[in-house]
Swiss-Prot record:
Residues 313-324, 440-452 have a biased composition (Acidic residues). This is Probable serine/threonine-protein kinase DDB_G0271538. It comes from Dictyostelium discoideum. The lineage of its organism: Eukaryota, Amoebozoa, Evosea, Eumycetozoa, Dictyostelia. Residues 1-10 have a biased composition (Basic and acidic residues). Gene3D superfamilies: Phosphorylase Kinase, domain 1, Transferase(Phosphotransferase) domain 1. It catalyses: L-seryl-[protein] + ATP = O-phospho-L-seryl-[protein] + ADP + H(+); L-threonyl-[protein] + ATP = O-phospho-L-threonyl-[protein] + ADP + H(+). Residues 325-359 have a biased composition (Low complexity).
Amino acid sequence: MNINFSKDDITGLPKSTKEEDENDFSSLDYSDLFMDVEIGRGSFGQVQKASYFGTDVAVKQLSTLVSIDPDYFKFMLREIKILKGMRHPNIVQYIGACCHEGRYMIVTEYIKGGDLHQFIKARGVSNISWTLRMKLALDIASAFSYLHSKKVIFRDLKAKNILVDEIGDGLYRAKVIDFGFARIFDGKDTNNLTICGSENTMSPEVIVGSSYNDSCDVYSYGVLLLELICGSRVVKTQLKRTPMNAFDMNLEKAEHLAPESCPRAFMDLAKWCCSYNPKDRPTFKIVVEGLKVLTNQQLKDLPVKGKSKPYIDPDEDSFIDPNDDSNNNNNSENNNNNNDNSNENNENNNENNNNSNENNNKKNKNGSGGDISGSSVIIKTDEEESFNSVVYKEHAVAQPLPNIDYGGQNKRQNNIFNPSFFTPPPNSKSMMDLKQSSAVDEDEDEDEDDVPSELLTSLTVNDIRYSNPKSFAATISTPNLNYATALDQDPPKPLSQSACATVLGGIPPMQPKKKPNNKNKKKKKKL
């Protein structure tokens, strides 16, 4: 099937010759593929296992929309041309592409394990050792450090786009897949970038349609780290970002929800990557060097987060004490007996049980945390001076660079000047609806890969951060974000006739015309 779209109109592509462009869709013969079972499905199509000259491969069959929609064709062409030029142990290996009966297919190496989302869900986040969590985090950061060095911006980093390959007994390797939203980024045309990605991991500047750069991948990586630390369910429900807080991550709440056995430096890294200001986020080069230091040390020697002070959520007026063992045990008993469970407990029972297991085992015999110590790991922020050791406060005093917010400790005091921005008006029905919607248990496997058809809003980040929520609640248009409905007010009720007369200055409302009596016409016809 011939393609009618012009490749010259597509930006963000690597440079190539005409001969290479013609071979993009015919680098292998479909008849050489022996298709097997389906192993995955997404908004762009389905993925099947196949055999290619005796080697197991994964075949991504793209949707038929690629042939008729120029946007889908653009994403497909970028994925092929970018993926075939990548060579990294933590990036899925590209094999070729072909077209069969009008359907385009991308063939890559086959990874036996599932994605990271399934990996966490099947095992339970508390059953994954901190050694493995930091190892997977290092693999992902290594891949993205390589991508950014090649001027590639990914724009859809999430757990479902990370495959976990079991390479040995208890040994795993993370690999990045699905380059459908990736593009070449030279840092010049930041205002022309399309808004795309998954709503749960998109950075604030991408959500509001502002200009962005490769630091949006760092923010998504920070959200992914919080999933490795707290669990996917906690990030999706209790740490859900909404327009009422300018899509900012509540890092103070995340600190309290994290298990006390989490290495202090690992938690600080996640908070640092989730900095609201893109300029405050680290580069992946810095992240890789820091994680290398952490993974090369014994976990028992690493300081852990420890117990957190009780926390009151200002948005929900709820008291959170994740380190109270008695509360966690009570939640576990209520879970087993199915007695006196509220909607909040129903959402978080599994996560509370996991947290209680970690809280009761601070030292963790399997090596998933060390003794609580007064020292803490300091992450350096100087790119030129890379990580070569972990610095402890009792051995050396580190001077942080100015204007760097380590995990957002000062964010709540500095980034919002209008206190009413976070405080809704009294008896606000929209806020009640927002709380109720956040209490609804959402399906973790819900597909989040839809391509937004339009900008979510024309407002910039500063417009949203410094404006009253009512002013942008009516402006924002979020067809792919489910919290837009919580901000919308109920439709007004129709006015009564007396009210209409009052509004119109005493003019009575127009009466509807009476329908003609068709029965008389029928009788006349009979006569």
